[in-house]
A protein has these predicted regions:
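Alpha-helical transmembrane segments of multi-pass membrane proteins
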Residues: 1-413, 418-429, 444-717
């Protein structure tokens, strides 16, 4: 998202400076529109071929620095061209020499309106019923229709008519020969080089792929391996199931939160009269398991003892009264906000109230038998310390993956080889891997003591829903592992203190203001440009805060998050519309104060939502408040865009295209800064509270700059 915004800003800015010197603007607009459509083909092809082009072996993860550079490469053409198209549209609507802010604002409104419709149609229709290249072809068709309409308007321009006709002919040739499906299959095959892809689907939550090698089926979700059948990882499934269940005398009810199919449920079915509740958010994922005629999957998912729920795990637990003897959390580490919710203090408290007196909660974290790096120790200690703040007893079985056992009763005495074997024999459970020798190795007291000693001197923050420290530690761990050069700089972020960050933020604002002044040498332009950047940044920070908060409270509910983004865009339209209607009466100083006060109200409402999130009635009301807040936040950028254009046009010798390109570019630049700072630094390290502080600083400095500009302009007169 951040890279899309910065590249679009570059496209808007560069074209804004050059467009006045281009004679045939309609022709260039049509060419750009066609190139924009073609750029999607290039981007999708690059996404699926980039590893082969860079000679990166299949299955090898990429570091943060390489991901950053690759996303710039993939998004380069569509983003740059899209930014350029905005400036072109604004210029084409202007007559020669005309400086009409209303027409510029209409371009902004219609572009945002298109984004809303595009987002809703993509989320609710396209992603469900069409492949990626079919979607690309649909976009191509819509753009060609626009070009045809333009060519009829400018029927005398033979170049426009010729290019449109040729492009239309080539497009329909591609459709006639069904090349979109051919390209789809070829690019998927390239991406999964060396494996036979037998199933490929995009659900509203995940990209689901099944490959086949000899007689083995491999399941992938978002390119990450899920499991393989029929040759399952016996060691893993037997450890995480039978070690905890050997402790429980008569287990009756089990809860699986994700990743239960492909071995876990199969082992649980060995226990008599065991009732299993299996929670999986993505229904399409389980439907995929059922489609493939694999014995172990049919046995697991068709068993009478297994109840399937297509829900968010956190939501499910909040709304049931059942007590469980065993809870298995299938996520291996809190690598993002969606998964992090299952490792927070708040969630552990809910879990504690949902397990029986001798109940056990099990999850796993990355580990090592021989060496724990500082970053790996931080990740483990963060989650384990958080669990220890809730559960009376937390035991760790260290290994290549650490098995964490949480309970309200002391189970340490039962974590001995003879006790585990005795418990399994009493329940008539047959196992393949968990023999006495292996258990002596896995439950070795010296290794457990060594692991605990490694964590003793590690200082970490606890993991909360609204302060997701574990997400940062996870990113830090993988950055150290995959991007050692970039890690040297990234690691310094976590050492930042709040006061230090505020100091750096103020210094950055001062430097930014000086840079703007050097380029513009106009006090009005300086304040207007800074306000465009700060408002773009504030809008993005608030929008991310809403999305993060919604995820924390309600999970990764794709439809609702798409709605949040759409309502944010709707707010931009309403803001721009109101500004156009009252262009003469609105003052920038008043708007900045208004935005500042609304930001304070925003966070007060968000705090209220957080404090009352456990109230069952309000829990169903709050999503509507989120939508209202999204409209409010979106209106910030929308309402200031026409005002800033009006001010700069009146106080600048620059042509109108240059002004429009600059304001749009600086608004997007602010959005880019907000996306990077909010998602990587502020939210995971300091929490939502500090996003509020950052917004207050940005808007107060805007007011100070506006006041100084006003004083300076009066003295000049």
């Amino acid at each position: 998202l951040g890279n899309w915004l910065i590249l679009e800003a570059i496209g808007s800015y560069l074209v804004g400076k050059k467009i006045e010197y281009i004679k045939d603007k309609i022709l260039n607009f049509v060419v750009l529109q066609i190139l924009f459509s073609l750029s999607f083909f290039i981007s999708v092809w690059l996404t699926r071929s980039i590893k082969l082009l860079l000679k990166i072996p299949f299955g090898v993860s990429l570091g943060v620095d390489l991901i950053f550079l690759i996303t710039i490469l993939i998004l380069f053409f569509p983003s740059i061209i899209h930014g350029a198209l905005f400036t072109y549209s604004a210029k084409i609507l202007q007559q020669d020499g005309e400086k009409n802010v209303v027409k510029i604002s209409k371009v902004y409104i219609f572009e945002t309106l298109g984004t809303i419709f595009g987002g809703i149609i993509f989320t609710y229709i396209l992603i469900k019923f069409f492949s990626i290249f079919q979607i690309v072809f649909i976009i191509f068709l819509l753009n060609i229709l626009c070009c045809i309409a333009l060519s009829f308007i400018n029927i005398k321009n033979k170049k426009v008519l010729g290019i449109t006709t040729l492009t239309s002919f080539l497009f329909f040739v591609l459709i006639f020969f069904n090349l979109q499906n051919y390209i789809e299959k070829k690019t998927i095959s390239k991406f999964w080089s060396g494996q036979e892809v037998i199933y490929y689907k995009n659900s509203i939550y995940n990209n689901i792929v099944v490959t086949k090698q000899n007689q083995q089926y491999n399941f992938f979700v978002n390119s990450y391996p899920l499991f393989s059948v029929p040759y399952i990882d016996k060691m893993f499934v037997e450890e995480v199931v039978h070690i905890p269940l050997s402790i429980i005398k008569k287990p009756k009810r089990v809860l699986i939160l994700g990743k239960g199919a492909g071995g876990i449920i199969n082992e649980l079915l060995k226990y008599e009269n065991l009732s299993i509740d299996y929670i999986e958010l993505d229904k399409d994922l389980l439907e995929t398991f059922k489609i493939l005629s694999v014995d172990i999957l049919k046995k697991e998912l068709n068993s009478r003892n297994v109840s399937l729920y297509y829900l968010d795990g956190c939501y499910f637990l909040k709304n049931i009264e059942t007590k469980y003897d065993f809870v298995f959390i299938g996520f291996s580490e809190p690598k993002d906000l969606q998964i992090n919710r299952f490792f927070t203090l708040e969630f552990f408290k809910i879990l504690k109230s949902k397990i029986s007196d001798e109940g056990v909660v099990t999850f796993q974290l990355p580990g090592s038998y021989v060496y724990l790096s500082k970053q790996l120790a931080e990740l483990n200690k963060c989650v384990i310390s958080t669990a220890k703040n809730v559960f009376k007893f937390v035991n760790v079985l260290p290994g290549d993956y650490n098995i964490i056992l949480c309970s309200n009763s002391d189970i340490t005495i039962h974590l001995a080889p003879e006790k585990v074997i005795s418990g399994l024999k009493e329940k008539n459970i047959l196992v393949d891997v968990l023999n006495e020798k292996y258990l002596e190795y896995r439950l070795n007291k010296e290794k457990i003591n060594w692991f605990n000693h490694q964590l003793e001197d590690t200082n970490v923050k606890l993991n909360y829903s609204f302060l997701p420290s574990a997400v940062f530690y996870s990113i830090n761990y993988w950055t150290a592992k995959l991007s050692p050069k970039f890690f040297k700089y990234f690691n310094k972020i976590q050492t930042l203190k709040e006061k230090t960050f505020v100091f750096y933020l103020l210094i950055s604002i001062l430097i930014l203001t000086m840079i703007i002044f050097l380029f513009t040498k106009n006090s009005t332009a300086v304040s207007s440009t800074y306000i465009a950047i700060s408002t773009g940044c504030v809008s993005m920070l608030l929008n991310l805060t809403l999305i993060f908060s919604f995820q924390v409270l309600y999970g990764y509910i794709y439809y609702q998050i798409a709605l949040l983004s759409s309502f944010f865009m709707l707010g931009s339209i309403l803001g721009a519309y109101l500004a156009v209607k009252h262009l003469r009466n609105l003052k920038l100083m008043g708007l900045e104060i208004f935005i500042l006060l609304l930001s304070v109200l925003f966070f007060l409402l968000l705090k209220t939502i957080k404090d009352f999130s456990n109230n069952k009635i309000l829990y169903f009301v709050f999503p509507y408040i989120f939508l209202i807040l999204s409209v409010l936040v979106g209106s910030f950028s929308g309402i200031e865009f026409p005002i800033l254009n009006k001010i700069l046009i009146e106080n600048s010798a620059s042509n109108i295209s240059s002004v429009v390109g600059k304001i749009y570019a600086f608004d997007l630049l602010g959005g880019w800064l907000g996306a990077i700072l909010g998602s990587i630094v502020i939210f995971p390290i300091f929490g939502i509270k500090f996003i509020f502080y950052a917004i207050i600083i940005l808007k107060i400095t805007s007011l100070i700059l506006l006041s100084l500009t006003s004083i300076y302009e009066r003295q000049r007169i």
